[in-house]
Regions:
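Extracellular/periplasmic, surface-exposed regions of secreted and cell-surface proteins
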Residues: 3-41, 51-249
Length: 249
């Protein structure tokens, strides 16, 4: 079997600071991979009984992404520190591929796919999905003693029906850095002491790309004649799996 693979990754970004403490960043990314494979089995092999085979497949995968964020930092009297992040992200994934195997090659020097007498396996595929997200995060720090963080985001996935495409998720967190309190700051044997609390939700959309759609498929299904048959019923009520987690540490 002969395989060929190559992959191309690229990222382009730009940062601007329109006013003091505000940074706006836009980033575009592309991830492309291509692979091919060729296999052959010579007719001279004993187990082939004088009938060779050859196959070829090819696949292409492309992921495009775009992220834009606005980050604002603000400090007051070296005691209060605030950090706000507002952002948007879009991801688009596409993959295509095909394969074909033929049999009946009669000569070891003619074992390409077209030298076969019949195709024994074939197929092609095309799949895609996309995401669109908007998110916010706010952080507060008081004298490196008390920390608070809140975050919220909404995500849309093409894997779900139009009425369940969007999911909303959030989180809250608090932390007390006890080691920096005056009564512990000079205790040398204690290097770190913190109490943290957090709660929030997260989402999962890892299902096949078209499970929400009613699909039909075709092929030589009726006495080797072409036909169409129902492949899956679809379910427009599919939506985000949501998990709520609480942590104390």
């Amino acid at each position: 079997c002969i395989r060929d693979r190559y992959k191309v990754l690229s990222t382009v970004f730009a940062n601007i600071t329109p006013i003091k403490n505000l940074t706006i960043r836009t980033q575009f990314g592309a991830d492309y991979s291509h692979s091919t494979a060729f296999m052959q089995s010579y007719p001279s092999y004993v187990i082939n009984n004088g009938m060779g085979s050859a196959g070829r497949n090819s696949s292409d995968v492309l992921t495009l992404s775009e992220t834009t964020t606005a980050n604002y930092r603000w400090e007051l009297n070296e005691s209060h520190s605030l950090n706000f992040l507002l952002g948007q992200e879009a991801v688009n994934f596409e993959s295509t591929g095909f394969q074909v195997v033929s049999r009946g090659q009669a000569n070891d020097k003619l074992t390409n796919v077209t030298s076969g007498t019949r195709a024994s396996a074939w197929g092609d595929s095309n799949s895609s999905y996309s995401y669109l997200s908007f998110f916010f995060r706010g952080e507060y720090n008081y004298k490196d003693l008390y920390y608070a963080e809140m975050a919220a985001r909404t995500d849309a996935s093409s894997r779900f029906g139009k009425d369940h495409r969007w999911g909303v998720f959030w989180s809250l967190g608090f932390m007390w850095n006890i080691k920096n309190e005056s009564f512990l700051k000079d205790v040398e044997w204690l290097t770190s002491a913190q109490i943290a609390l957090s709660t929030g939700t997260s989402g999962n959309s890892e299902i096949p790309n078209y499970d929400h759609l009613a699909l039909v498929a075709g092929g030589p299904n009726y006495n080797d004649e072409a036909g169409i048959y129902p492949k899956q019923p679809g379910n427009e009520d599919l939506g985000w799996e949501q998990t709520w987690a609480n942590n104390v540490g």
